[in-house]
Amino acid sequence: MAPAQVWQNLRPPPVPLHSADLPVENMLVHEAMNGMARYLVLFGLLVLASQGAAADWTVPGELQARVEALGAARRAFIESGAAIQVVPERQLIHELTVRDEDELASLVDDLMVVAGEMGYSPERDMGAAPLNLTSKRFSSAVTTPAALRKMKREAGPFSVHRYLNPRSGVPTFGGAKVAIWPEDLIAGKVDVAIMGVPSDMGSGQRDAASAPDEMRALNTIATPDTQSLVRPFEVLAVVDYGNLEVDRMSVERTVNHVAEMVAETARTGAVPMMVGGDTSMLYPGVKGVATTLGERSFGLLHFSAHPDAERHGDHTISDRQAIFRLLEDRIIDGGDTIQVGLRGPDVDQDTLQWLRDQGVRYHTMAEIRRHGFDKVLGRVRREVERGPNDFFVSVDVSALAPAEMIAAGRVEANGLGIEQLTKAIRHVCAAKNVVGFEITDLAPMMDLSDLSVINANAVLNACLVGIAVRKSGHEPDYVHPLALDHGRR
């Protein structure tokens, strides 16, 4: 029997019944009654969890009578706004308008069932994935003990390529040399260590785990900057630091390991550049740097369509909560946090007010459309200049418009252009001392043209160029004379 049929056909029994007292043909109905009770309890929990997201929802006046005719339970479900956690508001209004009474009752019953399944129930759901608490290691891919490292080779970056300028073979970020241990970073006086974090466990979308290897394989990093004519790999000591291990069964265990590895990298003096992976890895990336430099000792510049400040969800570690967790745990200061490019369904009145209360300087696409990108970028630059000397730069590729980044895990329309984004990143990475960088949420399988990977590499390269321009002693917006004029009349 379909869920809607169960809900439509049930009638409350005159006295409490036990399944053992029922004939076989009535047991299904009795079990459905128990199911209804459970769903009503779960619905109540869902209402409490969704109060922030549905705070602005009210039933249109012309549909109020139709909703009242559905009965108390269905009416409460619709009026609470819990239904719009399952279907879009516009679709719900359409269904309330066009369906007859029986069809509408059946639909609402189905929505209540779905809503109940979405909520967390201690009786049905585990609070966490069971872990072996006696295990003393992160995973089977345990890092090589320090005592065994000297037996392999001398410390320092090394090449895995047969040719000096390889176009094939083992792919590395920008064709860079490889480093494996902190000793390699120290011996090579490495400026930037680029590491993959192939995690997509913290997102409802998949394939972000493929992004590090796809960005390596396309090999469009380390290109010369046409503005300053600086070649970042000639100015900086850059290495491919490999992929960090992730636990594909536990985001929590992955978060701890990534934070430890980022902290270890930062202690060598190299800038950890993380290539994700989903945006849940923003939290351990920033936490790892803070472990080394100190909490609230640096600013965070976050380019994204999403505020990542969900406070009412079932989970506490996901790609929708990284900024909330960083602020809640006091790892970063709200006054030193800047967000650019916000748009989409997560940008609501409740979230923006919360960000404002935390002191976060956010810039939505509404602001950019009203005032123009250059004016808003100027405001962002001033905010960065007034901020700490050190900055962590984070880029969720959803900041870009779908025309230039269709492979974003949580794609949103009407975003920034690639030239706008790289211009902003290049400037900030040249104007401030970058202590960490990460790019996340690229899902390569969504774009067979490779345009999204090309643009993701361009974003990473923009920060490398900015760091190289700063190390070269140039002003952030330095332009080489040859790049401006061919010298002929």
Please state what every model-predicted region is.
Residues 56-194, 199-489:
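Conserved alpha-helical scaffold segments that buttress catalytic/binding sites
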Residues 41-49:
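Bacterial N-terminal signal peptides
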Residues 51-54:
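Sec/Tat signal peptide C-region and signal peptidase I cleavage site
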Residues 31-40:
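Bacterial N-terminal signal peptides that target proteins for export
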